[in-house]
Each structure stands twice: as C-alpha cells, then as structure tokens.
C-alpha cells in the first residue's frame, strides 16, 4: 500500500474507517545511511500526502482518528534509564530523523487543522515473519544456513524488545482510550544486549539442529 497515493482519499470515503493505523514506513537504520532519499520520500513526503487526504476525510467523519506509529529511535541514544514522552527528540540516523519529522508533521496537523491524530513511539519489535534484515531473524537465518553471525561493535548495545502481538494490543488500547494530540511510548521494560540475544539463539538452536562450522559470532567494527 502506497500511503502517498491519491487513491487513498477515495479508499477512505468508500470504506469510512473509524481509525487508520499508519504503520507504513522505511525502517532499517543501515539502509537509511546508504539511501536516505527513500526514507525521506516514504516517511515524510508520503505521510504529508496521507495527512492531506485524512484531513479532508475527518471533516466529514467526526468520529475517526489516525494513529501514527513511530519509533523510540527518535530520542537518540538513551544512556540511562528508559525514554519517556517528555524526552527531547535527538535522532542519530536518517531513519530516525525521517520518523521524527513525520511525528512533528502529524502533531502540527493536530494543532493547525484539528486533525484527530495520536502519535505512538515503540521500542524494537520482533515476531513471526519479520523482515530478515532485522537482528533476530537475521541471526536465526544465518544459523540455519551455516553463516557467520554479524554483531556490531562489542555486542553490548542494549535494546528494549517488544513482541509484535503485544505492540498490537497496546495500539488497540490507545485507539480505545488514547487522547487526540498525545504521544504514547510503547515498550516492554525488557532490555537485552545484542550479544546475549545471539548467544541465546545459538544455545536454543543447538537443542534442535546440528550447527554448521561457520556458525560463530563475527564482530563488526
């Protein structure tokens, strides 16, 4: 689905949704460094187009709302504790910057045009059928295919992991009880180092299959 398409307006008026959950985005940090243009187009320009179409739709349908799903990457590096909704935005990659810009754009439409929208910022998702460029599915794929397991730095980078089903349940709660114009952080309060995740997946895999000789951690500077 291209949220920047002009067909979105017709889809809205034909189907009359009570809520739109905007989860469409370019999301991979490394790819954003190599090709920031795609992230600017998808995460900013297309969100602008969606907002314009939703603005017209919401004028005719007063009970609808838009839930714009974003990321905790917009806060930058959290050196101590957890991020909260009052944290300043300090994006540290083109991906994070594009999501931060889209968050501000959505909020500006709430303030300026009274568009009924809510912004959420979630921690790192994981779950079935996740894109293989993400850490957990990438490690699993490499284990199954007798490849080295790439870990950046010393592997001590810690992430807060959120199961995708839990994320969906949180979004539904926000749809039912959230306030227009508010920001909501969604997380699990469960942090784990990348190296620990990798070792845990190796340990679990050993119980199921015979590991190939190439299955070993490779630290990447």
Model-derived regions, located:
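C-terminal substrate-binding subdomain of Rossmann-fold SDR/epimerase-dehydratase oxidoreductases
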Residues: 137, 143-221
